[in-house]
Regions:
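Flexible "cap/lid" loop of the alpha/beta hydrolase fold
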Residues: 108, 116-148
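Active-site loop/oxyanion-hole signature of alpha/beta-hydrolase fold enzymes
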Residues: 40, 44, 53-98, 266
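Conserved HGGG/HGGXW glycine-rich cap/lid loop of the alpha/beta-hydrolase fold
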Residues: 18-64
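Conserved serine/cysteine hydrolase catalytic core
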Residues: 189-236, 248
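Short glycine-enriched nucleophile-adjacent loop
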Residues: 100-111, 116
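Catalytic histidine-centered segment of alpha/beta-hydrolase-like enzymes
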Residues: 252-265
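Conserved alpha/beta-hydrolase catalytic His-Asp/Glu region
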Residues: 151-212
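Alpha/beta-hydrolase fold catalytic core
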Residues: 1-28, 47-51, 76-89, 114, ...
């Protein structure tokens, strides 16, 4: 469903979202190039306990792009306005990849979200690590765009799927072909992918917060096998958010909710429990 809200730019913005389950609200924020469907691997166990609100960030999925500047800041502003518009300010939040960085920013602002689980947040690179992420991701997306004609076949063939998803999943065989196909279409067609990727890699390191500033639990989760943002970046993330707890996902790439869905769902529910 689409609901109209307002961005701090005073520009009208539409944010597509789905709501599943009942109970205490839980916000899910996907990563760069993706959509709410990225969370399908853990949607069912979360919705059994919580009222899950999974959004498409502006310019991704079924949400139109923002008018004017598109950056990490304006995306954060748009999510903030969405939460206020729907009486969800202070709700618990989970983010993946770029979405993980956004929920860290919302936690830093104070009063926007409650408990937070940030899964492999982007932006804690140093020196050449930034270029590795940018070049690897940029080249991979070009390949995905070029292979769209063959993607239905690639998504259903285990060996081809494993080759395609090597940078992103340690267990591509466990992913549903329908999810893979939807994700690859999203990467190929998102109108603001290139611009947001450039802003992400050019942006200053994420602002942290002083010790003792958090009033709600914050967990930073990281896959030991993340080859886009190396595990040592998790230490920098925790240094920026010293009150956070660091959770390691063994045998996982950059998307723990893909490679370890049961562990990820359990971590989210435990962290955001009353």
């Amino acid at each position: 469903m689409l609901r109209r809200t307002r961005c701090t730019q005073a520009a009208s913005v539409l944010i597509n979202y789905v709501r599943r389950g009942e109970g205490k609200p839980l916000l899910l924020v996907h990563g760069l190039g993706s959509s709410w469907r990225s969370w399908q691997t853990i949607m069912e166990p979360l919705a059994a306990k919580r009222a899950v609100v999974a959004i498409d960030l502006p310019g991704f999925g079924k949400s139109p792009p923002l008018a004017g500047e598109v950056s990490l800041k304006t995306l954060s502003d748009a999510v903030t306005q969405f939460l206020h518009q729907h009486d969800l300010a202070g709700t618990d939040a989970v983010g993946s990849s770029m979405g993980a960085r956004l929920v860290l920013e919302l936690a830093r602002r104070g009063g926007v979200v409650g408990s937070v689980v940030s899964l492999d947040p982007r932006g804690f690179w140093a020196g050449w690590e930034r270029h590795v992420f940018h070049t690897s991701f940029w080249l991979w997306v070009r390949m995905v765009r070029a292979l769209q004609f063959a993607m239905p076949l690639v998504a259903t063939q285990a060996r081809l799927r494993a080759l395609l998803l090597a940078p992103f999943s340690a267990r591509p065989d466990a992913l549903a072909p329908s999810l893979v196909l939807e994700e690859m279409r999203g990467y190929a067609t998102a109108p603001w992918f290139d611009g947001v990727l450039s802003d992400l890699v050019r942006a200053s390191p994420p602002q942290g917060i002083a010790p003792g500033s958090l009033t709600k639990p914050l967990v930073i989760g990281w896959g030991r096998l993340d080859r886009l943002c190396f595990p040592r970046q998790a230490v920098r993330a925790q240094q920026a958010f010293p009150d956070a707890r660091l959770h390691w996902f063994e045998r996982c790439g950059p998307f723990p909710h893909w490679d370890a869905p049961e562990e990820t769902a359990r971590l989210i529910l435990e962290t955001t429990a009353d």
